[in-house]
Structure formats: C-alpha cells, structure tokens
From Swiss-Prot:
InterPro entries: YtcA. The chain crosses the membrane at residues 33-53, 70-90. The keyword Oxidoreductase does not apply. This is Uncharacterized protein YtcA. It is found in: Cell membrane; Membrane. Belongs to the YtcA family. The keyword Lipoprotein applies. A lipid is attached at residue 27 (S-diacylglycerol cysteine). Keywords: Cell membrane, Lipoprotein, Membrane, Palmitate, Signal, Transmembrane, Transmembrane helix. The gene is ytcA. Residues 1-26 form the signal peptide.
Length: 91
C-alpha cells in the first residue's frame, strides 16, 4: 500500500512538466515601446512615471509639514510600489 508521501511524489512526477512551461511563458513578446524610431523597454516608462508620482507625493508631504523617519526607505518603497502599480495597470 503506497504511503501518502509516495502518492504525493507520483503526483509531482505527473505534473512536473508544467513548471518549465510557466517559466518560459513570459518570453513570448518583448515589452518594448517604439518612441521616435527607437525601442525602449516598458519598465523604463514605468520607472519614469513612478519617479514623477513619487516626486508629487514628496511635494504633498512637504506642504503638509509631515516629518517622516527613514525618508530614503520610504521614498524608495513608494517608487517601487508606484512602478509595480503602473506595470500592473498598463502592461
């Protein structure tokens, strides 16, 4: 009688072929955007939009006279969050 572990190992062997399929599924198209004849990666536009939005957020925080601790970490995290949101929303 097979044990639970051996049954799990058998199921894993049956479905292990699908892992490489998911790993190469992102290789279908290059996420590049043509601008004036040159192709720029889409993450570049997400970074630019994120930088602009982070600077706007910084200006709002400064005008509200809010003092933040760990400013570098906070703005870096905001930049990353905004970039990922732009990527999720537009690409």
């Amino acid at each position: 009688m097979p044990t639970v572990l051996s049954r799990m190992a058998m199921q894993l062997k049956k479905t292990a072929w699908i892992i490489p399929v998911f790993m190469v599924s992102g290789c279908s198209l290059s996420p590049a955007i043509p601008v004036i004849g040159a192709y720029y990666p889409s993450w570049f536009f997400c970074a630019i939009a994120s930088l602009i939005l982070t600077l706007i957020t910084r200006r709002i925080i400064q005008r509200a006279n809010i003092n933040l601790a760990f400013v570098g970490i906070i703005y870096t995290a905001l930049f990353a969050v905004y970039a990922m949101l732009f990527w999720l929303a537009f690409f």
